[in-house]
Every structure is written in C-alpha cells, then in structure tokens.
C-alpha cells in the first residue's frame, strides 16, 4: 500500500491526477499565464467529456453556463464569489477549479468567527521574531500570500462566517493586488495568474453580511439547488459511489429505489410542497441539502456493512433521515411526524417499509 492509499481524502489534483494529465497532454489551445491548461480544457474537466479515449468524469452536474462564467472570471483581474444554500457544491466547485487551473487546491482559508486578519495577510514566528527581530525568515505567510507569490489561486471558504472587519481586509488585496509588509519595508505584488475563489452561504445561521465594497471586488455566481429530481438523483448516485470506493465500505451500493425515496423526501421538505404540487408541507428549521442526502446514504451503507447483511434496509435509511431532518428537537420532530402521517403514510405499498421504520424511529 502506498502512502497516498492511506490518506482519507486526497486533494482534487491528486484524486483526479490522471484526468488532469490527459487534458494537459492533449492541449491544443493557448494556455493563459499561470494556468496548467486552457479554459476549454478546464470546462471539460469540470463538466466531463472524452479526451484521447479517456473518460473525464463530471465534477459538477448543473448549469454549464455558470461554470463557463466562473472560468472566464478567473481569466480577468476579478475574484470569484460562489454563493448559495448549503450543499450546492460551492466548495466542491472551488476545489476543482483550483486543481484544474493551477494544479494546487490546498491554499485554503477556512472562514470562522475566530478568523483574524493575520490569517488573511501574514503573521510571525514569534520565537524567531523575539530572537532576531522582523525578517523574511520569521514571516508566516497566509495561503493568499503564497498564492500571490506563485500566481496561484487561494480559496476562502465560508467567507461570510468571518467578522465584517476581517472580511474587509481583503478589499485592499483585491484592489491593489499586493500585500504590504511595513515591518520589513517592502511589499509583495501578485504574480500573473493570481486569484481568489470565495464561497458564502445564503441561508445559514452564524453568518455576517458582506459589505458592498467587498462584494464589488468579486464576480458573484449563485449556485442553485438541483433544478429537477433527475439531476439531484444523478448527483447523489455518483457521489455515493465515489465515497463508497474511497471509504472502502463493504456494502452494496444503494438501489435506485432507495436513492429516489431519499431525494424525494428531501426535495419535498426543502420546497414545502409534494412533488405533484397537490399538498403543502411544513419545512423543517434546518437546510435539507443534496450533500446531506449523500451523507445519509453513505452512512446507511456503513450501517449495513457493520451491523446488517451488507445491503441497505429501510431501517438504515430511517435512522439517517431522523438525524438529517430533526435538528431542532421541539420544532422538527413535529414537522417530521406530520410529514410521515400526512404524506408518506398515504403512498403506495412500496413506501410502507420505510414509513414503518421512520415511525418507529420517531416514536
């Protein structure tokens, strides 16, 4: 077993290294400065296709035009902001754009309430600072600093979770394309190819509004939830299969019927309406995302492998549904019970096992 085989999750540029190598070797178009491949090849990497007889798997299943706008934005001097509800593949798309364009998706700042301006610009190795005073050797460079030096892409995840004054530290970086270090009396200009891809949630707790001045420095793309149930089912099926292989889950992949049921329940609760639009549904307090449907089915496989017979049952799915939907014990338990009694119970016999398992979990 190689060292990489023992890693729980590889960065995109390593996980899909063969596809990236094929696209680079087959390149016939002009490659922008600082990029590994042409914009058209980046699009093929993200949306899928066939190159030199090699199948390039789609990384993002959705509106192709949005991906084209994202790629073209990174050709300009504008940064890119991907916004949307939780689970709309913002981080996933950000990672794969960075991997395809620069070959490195690991220059990441994770935005939190505790993120400081030093984590955006630079900080110091204080032992060296005290011993020798300010020097380049004592400088601790942020991911954005390192991306500016090499002309790469820095990723800023959950930017809206940072305090507003910390967010605004980006304004001068995005405007001037340089970081000043007054302690050393010099500044670092951004090399060609440098850009920032930020992500932000539109519907979540614990977020801070971005200032208009900061928003003006970004090209903003809103990533929607999957437009139809067929697309969402395809996304869930593909990701569950990939995760099952990566995690070496010793259980059969979920049947199409199980995926359809989970996605149907999630879409109806998310939209507050049954799929046939005949009955309104009270939505739960939390966000019911595609990412959670993927996580639910993956966990159901783990349950089936460890404590079942290697095949997902209604009881495995019911356990996952309970945890995914009932996030607020007081409000969501009632919402879930009403959905079971008013919607799921009235469906045909093929839903009966899942209904009974869910009722038992929600007792």
Residue positions per predicted region:
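AAA+ P-loop NTPase catalytic core and its hallmark functional loops
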Residues: 2-247
């Amino acid at each position: 077993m190689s060292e990489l085989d023992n890693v729980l999750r590889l960065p995109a540029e390593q996980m899909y290294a063969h596809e990236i190598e094929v696209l680079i070797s087959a390149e016939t178009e002009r490659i922008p400065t600082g990029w590994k491949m042409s914009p058209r090849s980046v699009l093929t990497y993200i949306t899928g296709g066939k190159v030199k007889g090699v199948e390039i798997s789609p990384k993002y299943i959705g509106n192709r035009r949005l991906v084209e706008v994202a790629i073209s934005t990174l050709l300009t001097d504008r940064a890119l902001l991907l916004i949307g509800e939780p689970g709309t593949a913002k981080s996933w798309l950000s990672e794969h754009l960075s991997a395809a364009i620069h070959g490195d998706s690991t220059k990441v700042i994770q935005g939190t309430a505790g993120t400081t301006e030093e984590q955006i610009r630079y900080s110091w190795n204080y032992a060296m600072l005290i011993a020798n005073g300010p020097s380049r050797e004592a400088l601790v460079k942020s991911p954005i600093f390192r991306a500016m030096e090499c002309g790469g892409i820095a990723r800023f995840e959950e930017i809206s979770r940072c305090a507003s004054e910390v967010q605004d530290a980006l304004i001068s970086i995005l405007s001037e394309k340089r970081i000043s270090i007054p302690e050393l009396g010099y500044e670092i200009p951004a090399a060609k190819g440098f850009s920032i891809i930020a992500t932000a949630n539109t519907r979540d707790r614990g977020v801070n509004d971005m200032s208009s001045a900061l928003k003006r420095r970004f090209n903003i793309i809103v990533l929607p939830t999957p437009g139809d149930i067929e697309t969402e089912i395809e996304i869930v099926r593909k990701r569950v299969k990939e995760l099952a292989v990566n995690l070496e889950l010793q259980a059969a992949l979920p049947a199409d019927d199980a995926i359809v049921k989970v996605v149907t329940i999630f879409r109806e609760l998310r939209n507050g309406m049954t799929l046939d639009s005949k009955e309104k549904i009270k939505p739960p307090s939390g966000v019911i995302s595609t990412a959670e449907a993927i996580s639910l089915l993956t966990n159901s496989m783990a349950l089936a492998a460890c404590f079942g017979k290697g095949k997902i049952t209604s009881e495995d799915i019911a356990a996952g549904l309970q945890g995914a939907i009932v996030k607020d014990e007081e409000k969501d338990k009632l919402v879930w019970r009403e959905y079971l009694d008013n919607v799921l119970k009235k469906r045909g016999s093929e839903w009966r096992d899942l209904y009974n398992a869910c009722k038992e979990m929600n007792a």
